[in-house]
Regions:
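Zinc-dependent deaminase catalytic domain
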Residues: 1-110
């Protein structure tokens, strides 16, 4: 999974902070749906990788019951944890027993 996340992270658009994030949601059928962060100059209207992955999953016809686990990787040495808005989305759209895996840029997972 870490290698997939590193490949996906290359697509992030982080021209302001240069902090890239990749997210992969694994579905019950083991299909992977991806997302990356997209920054905007105003700093407010960008999108987190988790938000993009969730939107992509719904766009592809999946529903909340299809979500199996979520993986998030950031481009720094620190473990990338979902922000407060993404935690709210995870709480709303994912079942309580959904596994959340958070990685740093070296693939260390928590």
């Amino acid at each position: 999974m870490k290698e997939n996340l590193k490949l996906v992270m290359k697509n992030a658009y982080a021209n302001i902070s240069n902090y890239k994030v990749a997210c992969i949601i694994v579905m019950q059928n083991n299909q992977e749906v991806i997302g990356v962060n997209i920054e905007n100059k105003d700093g407010k209207s960008g999108m987190c990788a988790e938000q993009v992955a969730i939107a992509n999953a719904f766009s592809e016809g999946f529903s909340t019951k299809d979500f199996k686990e979520i993986h998030v990787m950031g481009s720094s040495k620190g473990i990338c944890m979902p922000c407060f808005m993404c935690r709210e989305l995870l709480h709303e759209y994912f079942l309580p027993d959904t596994k959340v895996f958070c990685y740093n840029n070296r693939g260390k997972c928590k």
